[in-house]
């Protein structure tokens, strides 16, 4: 196939293409204009074979044209030395030539399908070729562990691990600086950690060649090889600054046609500052060489960022809009209320004061904590006065005077119609206690409330009165006739009132007052 010319391959591919187009038109006419799909092509083995042959010829034509364009003095594939002659059985070369070749490599300007990582995340020194040579078994044939020189915190020098006291030796021992001849001997025997590109290029490696039309790698142009070796990925800040400084020094060393004194004075102090101490090398390069032609700065490719607003900013904006809308509505509502209030107000003179329409609200406080007692007038029977042994004339005159004065003092507290026998006789047991008759609970109580309540006697006074009444009168008084006394006692007696006694502080026995049953009082006390 290597001897075939590009024109022959193009003629064969054009003939196959014409046959395939004719079959596609016939298929579309037979199937109502439907185009042939992959399943339809697989059902026709002859057409499928033609499709495969056509794709093989197109890829072969492309590879041959690419080789002639980039490497016109290339050696034929048959004349190239084979890498492993013992591995290929006889006759396999012809069979491999007849087989379908692999897909041709993409051109240098084609877009890669999916990169493994972003170029900004790579170090320009860690190229794939360096890693492939570092971890290839052919490079470290005599090393026990090739990863020993690449991974680990152990200090190393020229691929050998340094001991604790190796740095103290100055006598040209194992730690002395190796010469060029020693380096040449060590490189082939021991594994080395690649430090620079030059060291990696000196590692001996067998040429990897394959038998077939795509045996060697695609030759790259000078610009592409430089970009891959020097600027494989986005350069770091330190490397880019170094490049700018080197270019600066090269431009500064060239003699300028008319150097001025100001330029010389400004260039001297800038050259004294080291590159790693300068703040911005790119700004310094632009200021010192405004018209110089140097390396254009390479734009650092960064990951795309979201240019628009974030979610929180959008939510906050919506909230602000809603609050502004609510504020406007509230202002309008307040204006309407103010207008209505102004229309409803009238003149103060035309308004009539209405006092009885709405009762004033009074907040209720604590209820009554003490029992309210409504005292009623108590009528007690008068006691009989003790008669002293004196002359009848004196007693009669005194009694008449006293009775007249006392009756004038308290006339309304005595019951009318009291018989004189009751005054002389022994009082009943009810005289010891206050009289509370059920008849007093009737409506007549309200009539008697107009009268001033009389002071009730205390318990000790009543006992004293009862004892004084029970005492038998002396025999002399009983033997004497008392017609005058009986006539005088028909009049109501006065009632003694103690001014210090209080009407509310006395024991009351209101048995039938608000009682639902015998013995159940207001608070349900047991008697």
Curated annotation (Swiss-Prot):
Residues 518-527 have a biased composition (Gly residues). Residues 60-226, 244-303, 340-527 are annotated as: Disordered. Residues 180-191 have a biased composition (Low complexity). It comes from the Eukaryota. The keyword Amino-acid biosynthesis does not apply. Residues 361-375 have a biased composition (Basic residues). Its main location: cytoplasm. GO terms for cellular component: cytoplasm; DNA replication preinitiation complex. Keywords: Cell cycle, Cytoplasm, DNA replication, Nucleus. It is found in: Cytoplasm; Nucleus. Residues 136-147, 279-291, 342-358 have a biased composition (Polar residues). Residues 391-407, 438-447 have a biased composition (Acidic residues). Residues 60-70, 246-255, 474-499 have a biased composition (Basic and acidic residues). The keyword Cell cycle applies. One of its GO terms (biological process) is DNA replication initiation. Pfam families: Drc1-Sld2. One of its GO terms (molecular function) is DNA replication origin binding. Has a role in the initiation of DNA replication. Required at S-phase checkpoint. Belongs to the SLD2 family. This is DNA replication regulator sld2.
